[in-house]
């Protein structure tokens, strides 16, 4: 596992087309923004696990929208 330190407003790149930006830190929560092509699925881990189990009904719809 690669461990990186980033400050609010800083970005890291995954490959040529995915960027992850630290939007804010409040207590023990970190808000991140992810920019990725439409053909790259981006899910929270618990949603991804539901999809893998075939339990998509438990999802909230598009995971690419802000929560």
Curated annotation (Swiss-Prot):
Gene Ontology terms describing biological process: mRNA catabolic process; negative regulation of translational initiation; positive regulation of translational initiation; regulation of carbohydrate metabolic process
Alphabetically ordered keywords of this record: Activator, Cytoplasm, Repressor, RNA-binding, Translation regulation
Molecular function as annotated in GO: mRNA 5'-UTR binding
Primary localization: cytoplasm
Intrachain disulfide bonds: none
Example of a GO cellular component annotation carried by this entry: cytosol
Record localization: Cytoplasm
Domain of life: Bacteria
Role according to the record: A key translational regulator that binds mRNA to regulate translation initiation and/or mRNA stability. Mediates global changes in gene expression, shifting from rapid growth to stress survival by linking envelope stress, the stringent response and the catabolite repression systems. Usually binds in the 5'-UTR; binding at or near the Shine-Dalgarno sequence prevents ribosome-binding, repressing translation, binding elsewhere in the 5'-UTR can activate translation and/or stabilize the mRNA. Its function is antagonized by small RNA(s).
Cross-referenced HAMAP family: CsrA
Family: Belongs to the CsrA/RsmA family.
Subunit text: Homodimer; the beta-strands of each monomer intercalate to form a hydrophobic core, while the alpha-helices form wings that extend away from the core.
Name of protein: Translational regulator CsrA
Organism encoding this protein: Stenotrophomonas maltophilia (strain K279a)
Lineage: Bacteria, Pseudomonadati, Pseudomonadota, Gammaproteobacteria, Lysobacterales
Gene that encodes it: csrA
């Amino acid at each position: 596992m690669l461990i990186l330190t980033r400050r609010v407003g800083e970005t890291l790149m995954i490959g040529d087309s995915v960027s992850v930006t630290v939007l804010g830190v409040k207590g023990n929560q970190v808000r991140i923004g992810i920019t990725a092509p439409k053909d790259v699925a981006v899910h929270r881990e618990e949603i991804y696990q539901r999809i893998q189990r075939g339990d998509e009904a438990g999802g909230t719809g598009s995971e690419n929208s802000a929560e």
